[in-house]
């Protein structure tokens, strides 16, 4: 979730947060 909060480009947030 931290990556998504930082606004990481691409879909890194999704990869790290499979949960979502």
UniProtKB/Swiss-Prot annotation:
Positions of disulphide bridges: none
Main location, first listed in the record: secreted
One Gene Ontology term of the molecular function aspect: serine-type peptidase activity
GO cellular component, one term: extracellular region
Entry's Gene Ontology BP terms: proteolysis
Regions annotated as coiled coil: none
Subcellular location: Secreted
EC number: 3.4.21.-
Region (Disordered): 1-20
UniProt entry keywords in alphabetical sequence: Hydrolase, Protease, Secreted, Serine protease
Function, in words: Capable of breaching the insect cuticle.
Family: Belongs to the peptidase S8 family.
Protein name: Cuticle-degrading protease-like protein
Source organism (scientific name): Metacordyceps chlamydosporia
Source lineage: Eukaryota, Fungi, Dikarya, Ascomycota, Pezizomycotina
